[in-house]
Amino acid sequence: MNSSQHRPLGHARARRSAVARFAATLLPRRAGALALALLLALLLAGCGGVAEEGTGIQPSASVGTLEGLSDTSVSVNGVNYSRSAATTLSDGFGQAITADQLRLGMWLEVVGTVDETGNQGEAQTIRVRPASRGVVSASDGATLSITLFNSSVRLSGSTVLEGTPNAAALSVGDVVEVHGPQRNALGDVSASRVERLAVAAPVAPAFARHELRGRTSQLNPAAQTLLVGRRLVSYATAQVTLRRSLDNGQMVRVAATGAPPAAGTAWAVERLTSDLALPANLGFLYTEGYVDGLLAGPLFVLEDLPVDASTANGRSSVTANDQRVAVVGPLTQGTLKARSVALVTPGVPVVFTLSGPVTDYVSAASFKLRGVPIDASAATFVAPATAASLVDGVRLRIKGTVRGRGLAASQVELLP
């Protein structure tokens, strides 16, 4: 047990109360049983994840879908993290990006702190973690899936789309950027966001950078080749930046200006880097993903993050690979020591929150917020907001679910 065992009992109770409030707000879009499981786990946790003395501030990290976006904040896993001039924003390779590049549905890693209410946090770093960016080699509108870098990308009714009216319109040869968690070591992805960057042409469109994130296998040091997911890669001339010696089973990110050649021929990449940027030790982490490499305990991995759920609340629910789970607990020497594991129910709609000025106003059924098409014709307007108050320039906060490449608003509020 850490130094909190020497603190007064009243302080410990206050800390547990604060953590409980934090847990209660982690998953507002999830089923009640899931939120309750996380809440109970943190209520019972007596060690780890200790708030800073006397502040109610909980050091934390969240990995998941960008579900809320405003001029000064992002929301991930139900916590609204404020951004400031001190917040570092970067892409998967650690290159600086701007807040204007953030989009709903992106897969984010946020490291920062959360206050005792559990509703608000402060982001120290925000990293965008796309799964892949490249040319579609197969598309199946019936199953809502596409193939990229030989791996399957599965879309759903909650996948945020941009640049295409619907999933069925994605075609072989399109250049897309995909976000979402990987389902297995072969690099199959459950898409939280798909953006079409270029439309298919007789010749594959030129694009600045093709990128792939995946787990390594079949490493051949002599030939300097390996598989990333299902894609054969040559790193002979690549800039290599790794946290440890290259080996099988690592999560890496590769990129090159040129598109990959035909299957079976190694793709000569220009960059090869470790993907996992989380610190080895962290007081509290909330993440979602798909169970892989399941062993008794249960012990498993989420992408390449080892999870020890042997003492976690809800551990008996983890019975097979490819289950989507939510996990909370501290990171200890690179392993997530789960306080709680809970299944994420398939098909539960994701409620997104978007704030900003109205643009391109036509009617309550057709306007934009931060470039996203909005249909508020069936929304509840929170007074003093009304449908009549919708004009270009008025600032709104809307909540809604995905409909095509926009949002169907369920609630509309006016902002100052």
Which stretches of residues belong to each language-model region?
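Sec-dependent bacterial lipoprotein signal peptides
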Residues: 1-45
